[in-house]
């Protein structure tokens, strides 16, 4: 069933894995990709709870678009332990124009399927999603 401006469907596994990340903290991050053959957003990679932000950024392809969610743990200025779920739209400059357009037109609808996103980041190169930027957006 397609449900976005681009006619893109969202695989049920995407929603189920996101719920596991949110409710059970079963994963540190999830990377999603659009399978153009079947016109559907699917799970590309699951990050285990012990994996770091560096592990997450290392698994994003240098020349292909992806969506991702990352469960970011941090300590506030008041010394409180918190976490926020980031939605990251990764569209590197070196990716195909058609791919960038497809990801851009499907993003809002896909994001609505993932109830509980707290912060959104868009990045075209690694510097736009550095740890400093993530920390500043979380606080």
Swiss-Prot record:
Domain ADF-H: 5-139
Cellular-component GO terms for this entry: actin cytoskeleton; cytoplasm
UniProt entry keywords in alphabetical sequence: Actin-binding
PANTHER family, sorted: COFILIN-RELATED
Gene3D superfamilies the UniProt entry points to: Severin
Family (UniProt): Belongs to the actin-binding proteins ADF family.
GO terms under biological process: actin filament depolymerization
Pfam families: Cofilin_ADF (PF00241)
Entry-linked InterPro entries: ADF-H (IPR002108), ADF-H/Gelsolin-like_dom_sf (IPR029006), ADF/Cofilin (IPR017904)
Organism, scientific name: Oryza sativa subsp. japonica (Rice)
GO molecular function: actin filament binding
Keyword Cell membrane: no
General function of this protein: Actin-depolymerizing protein. Severs actin filaments (F-actin) and binds to actin monomers.
UniProt keyword Ribonucleoprotein, yes or no: no
Name recorded for this polypeptide: Actin-depolymerizing factor 1
